[in-house]
C-alpha cells in the first residue's frame, strides 16, 4: 500500500509537470529547472537516502513504480540517477551537492584527464558521479568539455587532470560483484518497463479508435496478432524489471539486474517496431507523442549495456558461478523473498 502511495504521487506530479510540451522544450534546449524543482520539493530525489541523513530511507523495491512512471512520462531529467547518487554519497558520509546528478563510468587518460562517454542525461545534470579505475569522483558538468552523444540529452564529457584532482573523491564502497553499471541498469530497466507499457497502451487505444474499411483496425486479425505479441513483451519485461529492483536497501542483486535489463532491452526493439507498424506514417511525425517514447526505447536499450551484454552476464553466472542445475539457478534468481 505504501508503495502505491509513492507511485500515485509520482504519477500525479508527472502528469501535471512532465507534459509532452515540456519534454519537447527541454529536448530543444529549454531549462529543466522548474521541473527539477518540483521533483526536489516533492522529496523524490532523497527517497533512497537514510532517514538519519535527511532522506526517506526507502528501498529499491519501493521505488520501482516511481521509476516506471518516470519512464512512462519520458522524464527528461536524471531523477533515478540522483536518487542512487545521493544514497551512495550519504552511505560514504560525503556531502551531497544540490541539483541533479548523473551517473557514469569514466576512463582515466595517461595525462590524468577523465573521459565519460556517453553520460545519460548529462546535458540536464548539474554534477556527475563517476566510477573509474582509481575510485570515484564527483564532478560539476559546468567545468567539463562537452560533446553531443547519440540521444539528444546524453553527452560525452571530459575533465582535465587538474579538475579531477580538485574534485571530491567520495569513498564509496559497493558490495562484491556490483558496479555503477549494474546500479544504473536496474534503474533503466524499470524506466523501460514504464515506457513499454505506455507505448502499448497508446497503441492499443489507437487501434481501437482508428477506423478503416468501416471498422476499427484493432478488429483485424493481423493487428490483433501484433498487439498480442506486444503485450507478451510488455508484461514479461515488467515482471523482469520488478525482479531487478527486488530486495532490501539500495543495492540490487547483479544476476537479477542482468535478467531485468536483458529482457527489457530485448522487448524495446520489438515493441517499438510493432507500435510504429500499427500507427503507420503518423507515428513517425515529430508532432505525434509516440516518438517521445520510442526514441527512448531505442536509446535506453543500450544504456548500461544492451541485452547482449547482460545475456553474457547471466550465462557466465550459469557456467562459472553456480554449482546446481539451471532450474536451481532460475528458482533462486526469481524467488524475490531470497
Where are these regions (language model features)?
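Alpha-helical interface subdomain recognition
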Residues: 1-73, 185-338
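FAD-binding core of flavoproteins
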Residues: 74-80, 87-201, 327-338
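A cross-family signal for key residues in well-ordered alpha-helices
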Residues: 67, 86-87
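General alpha-helical segment detector with a strong preference for membrane-spanning helices
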Residues: 54, 85-86, 108, 284
